[in-house]
């Protein structure tokens, strides 16, 4: 990295921090602020989905590092539907095709997520290893599938390697008027879908029997099995749901008419959203509701970080600050865990000491005999009167 002609003084540091914390509001004119706000919300949508995907798996005691592959599978399934059915000029039919595309993408992601879940449940293979393998398998499937469909590749000037967008086929994500509220941005109804799904997952985890079983399995798999719960079923279903959520994130992102997918027939990269969902889930303590706000916060900082470059700062500063926030959040959780363990240990020691003292008291009472009862002295009886006290 080159730091030539970049701001390096302390005053510049505070200036850069103000730009970063200003987020979309540090972009200057009101029109740019509105556009940046809309884009911030749009780019937070897939991050919410991958974050909730990681969170629900973690609740079941699993680490879903395969969200990137599930994201790609959801994108692939949805684009195969949306780009092969042309509904231009028929918006009503276009909405139906869009719904179908999202559902197909979700099913693809669920099936892909079930693979590491199945190996974990049946063969006790660590899901991290299987997820890493399925990530790259998914990337190769993308290259293979779209390589068989050259008619989906954009042949326009300067667009080499990109797929056509849903703007060509008329099956883009509905905007529901949000594009008028945030003019010039990519925002669409995907954010509403993401929020509804995140809230639904939270309700499912906290208010339903199935959610309780997932959390019980995550707390103690074998204890849940002893209690009569199907640990294997819960593990497979948890990873299937996680895969479906990450896949919907990929579908919502690439079904937007303004987003192009960079297709590489030789080496398909893994999307950053699949991995960025991990810190989003960790910062939100794996709470689906909290993940919504964390994703928006991360995108808020990224938007501010994008304005740093034009002000003469290094563009990676925002990533460094977000990484520091994640580390401090992790340390705070570690500190809380340590303190809770100390309190639990102290409570056990206190209870043990009280129990020992009570047992000693019982032993003392059983060893020391009871004192004999005192005999009452009776007054002498007079021989003459037969009355007590007369002599």
Residues of each region from the PLM?
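Helix-loop-helix "hairpin" substructures at the membrane interface of multi-pass membrane proteins
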Residues: 70, 182-261, 288-289
